[in-house]
């Protein structure tokens, strides 16, 4: 308790009076200062925590965004439709900085050795090219590219060689694009792309028009045509055989057909390999009975598709988004916490008015890439993405496209190129597979021998089959068969 001040003595009345002393309880300054300090510290901690979490989330998203394509083949708004405008602006700033940083980044000793050897091979290749020794020059250019596949100078010079010597302007433009992805300020690559981009786009558009013509020719064949029915049945078996084969299934085409027709097990093969085939069968029947007739494709439809794909192999995970982080080679898909939002955005893009104006092959290939890039499932992402792609193609009058398992390495290579920034090679690959599938149907329903091309298991069988073909169009049929059988070299 505070004591009161004593009354002043009479002499002190003539002096200045002073204020009476305050007790500790009556002085608010220390307590108020203490509260202000606590408030400042708490506010600072809260602001720092919010900034750290926001920055971490943004950086994580940008790590995912930098995989998305920036190709000329499809418009930017189509390629980035999964993300908001704010994220795209952030992506652009991050991407420009990360690319410029990567150009000047230090290399490991092994990488430096490879680059040095690649540049040496590049100089020799250019000298041989000027000397008219094109074959040797081509081999050295390829050697340089193998040693330093992401060096701007190697990409640029090899592209120029392909454009001017090999007359392959499409592949040349692809390498110019890659060079600009790594070194955006490369003036020579910019000049080359300005020269080639419109030409390549025109070639791509003409290719799509050709596919439409073949689709229309196939559509003109009546459904009652016996050859068409047999072709559809054979293509059904081939589609399942190749799609599971891409994922590592070792069943032969004959074994796949036997399982689907008899439902009997094949000796020496695992239960999972049997169930993968049965799951694809269920999913394709679901597409034919339901999805093809639907106007919009929803997340629920995709989950139902996946539930059938994985239903026999892993019924617990079938039709469910993954709950753990997964890693796919050099690609790190989004975390499980972001899948719901990303799939909602994917669904909006899938059913948007503008997406419906894309060419069906562009639309289907891009949908395939977007879904496999999000990688929403623990397993079965590739099979589900290919089934979704074929659903979209079938709605546009195309048959389900067969991606041969012998082309597996190219398939994954083009997906990797899409992750690195250029989706056009992947779209062209899907266009190639679409054309070969159309050719398969047209060949089977033509006046040529009515035996449907099978996927030959050995070279000797292929030779025997080709020897039986008696027609002026042997070369054309040989090209079709080679695409499905050998899996070697470029797509004919």
From Swiss-Prot:
Disordered as annotated region, ranges: 1-21
Pfam families cross-referenced by the UniProt entry: Fic (PF02661)
EC number, UniProt record: 2.7.7.108, 3.1.4.-
Residue ranges of TPR repeats: 118-151, 152-186
Catalytic activity field: L-tyrosyl-[protein] + ATP = O-(5'-adenylyl)-L-tyrosyl-[protein] + diphosphate; L-threonyl-[protein] + ATP = 3-O-(5'-adenylyl)-L-threonyl-[protein] + diphosphate; 3-O-(5'-adenylyl)-L-threonyl-[protein] + H2O = L-threonyl-[protein] + AMP + H(+)
Organism: Drosophila simulans (Fruit fly)
Any one annotated GO CC term: plasma membrane
Inhibition and activation profile: The side chain of Glu-247 determines which of the two opposing activities (AMPylase or de-AMPylase) will take place. In response to endoplasmic reticulum stress, mediates de-AMPylase activity. Adenylyltransferase activity is inhibited by the inhibitory helix present at the N-terminus: Glu-247 binds ATP and competes with ATP-binding at Arg-386, thereby preventing adenylyltransferase activity. In unstressed cells, disengagement of Glu-247 promotes adenylyltransferase activity.
PANTHER family, per the entry: FIDO DOMAIN-CONTAINING PROTEIN DDB_G0283145 (PTHR13504), PROTEIN ADENYLYLTRANSFERASE FICD (PTHR13504:SF34)
MF term (GO), any: protein adenylylhydrolase activity
Its job: Protein that can both mediate the addition of adenosine 5'-monophosphate (AMP) to specific residues of target proteins (AMPylation), and the removal of the same modification from target proteins (de-AMPylation), depending on the context. The side chain of Glu-247 determines which of the two opposing activities (AMPylase or de-AMPylase) will take place. Acts as a key regulator of the unfolded protein response (UPR) by mediating AMPylation or de-AMPylation of Hsc70-3/BiP.
Full protein name: Protein adenylyltransferase Fic
Species lineage: Eukaryota, Metazoa, Ecdysozoa, Arthropoda, Hexapoda
């Amino acid at each position: 308790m505070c004591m009161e001040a004593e009354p002043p003595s009479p002499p002190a009345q003539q002096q200045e009076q002073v204020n009476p002393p305050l007790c500790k309880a009556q002085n608010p300054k220390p307590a108020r200062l203490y509260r202000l300090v606590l408030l400042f510290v708490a506010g600072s901690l809260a602001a720092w925590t919010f900034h750290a979490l926001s920055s971490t989330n943004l950086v994580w998203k940008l790590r995912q965004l930098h995989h998305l394509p920036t190709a000329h083949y499809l418009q930017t708004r189509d390629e980035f439709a999964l993300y908001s405008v704010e994220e795209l602006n952030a992506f652009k700033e991050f991407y420009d900085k990360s690319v410029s940083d990567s150009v000047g980044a230090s290399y490991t000793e092994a990488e430096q050795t490879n680059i040095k050897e690649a540049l040496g091979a590049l100089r020799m290749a250019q000298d041989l090219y000027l000397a008219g020794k094109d074959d040797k020059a081509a081999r050295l250019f390829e050697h340089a590219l193998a040693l330093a596949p992401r060096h701007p100078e190697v990409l640029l010079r090899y592209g120029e060689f392909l454009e001017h010597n090999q007359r392959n302007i499409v592949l040349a433009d692809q390498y110019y694009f890659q060079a600009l992805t790594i070194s955006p300020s490369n003036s020579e690559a910019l000049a080359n792309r300005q020269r080639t981009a419109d030409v390549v786009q025109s070639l791509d558009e003409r290719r799509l028009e050709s596919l439409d013509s073949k689709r229309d020719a196939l559509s003109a064949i009546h459904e009652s045509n016996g050859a068409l029915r047999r072709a559809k049945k054979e293509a059904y078996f081939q589609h399942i055989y190749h799609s599971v084969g891409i994922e590592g299934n070792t069943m032969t085409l004959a074994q796949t057909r036997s399982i689907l027709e008899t439902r009997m097990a094949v000796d020496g093969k695992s239960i999972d390999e049997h169930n993968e085939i049965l799951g694809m069968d269920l999913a394709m029947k679901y597409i034919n009975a339901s999805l093809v007739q639907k106007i919009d494709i929803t997340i629920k439809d995709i989950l139902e598709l996946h539930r059938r794909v994985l239903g026999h192999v892993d019924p617990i995970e079938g039709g469910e988004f993954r709950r753990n982080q997964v890693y796919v080679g050099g690609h790190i898909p989004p975390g499980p916490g972001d899948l719901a939002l990303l799939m909602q955005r994917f669904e909006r893009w899938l059913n948007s008015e503008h997406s419906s104006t894309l060419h069906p092959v562009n639309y289907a290939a891009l949908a395939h890439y977007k879904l496999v890039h999000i990688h929403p499932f623990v397993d079965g992402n590739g099979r589900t993405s290919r089934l979704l792609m074929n659903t979209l193609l079938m709605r546009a009058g195309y048959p389900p496209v067969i991606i041969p398992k012998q082309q597996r390495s190219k398939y994954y290579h083009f997906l990797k190129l899409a992750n690195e920034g250029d989706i056009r090679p992947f779209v062209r690959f899907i266009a190639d597979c679409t054309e070969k599938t159309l050719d398969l149907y047209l060949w089977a329903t033509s006046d040529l021998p009515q035996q449907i091309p099978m996927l030959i298991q050995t070279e000797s069988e292929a030779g025997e089959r080709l020897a039986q073909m008696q027609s002026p169009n042997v070369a054309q049929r040989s090209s079709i068969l080679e695409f499905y059988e050998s899996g070697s070299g470029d797509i004919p």
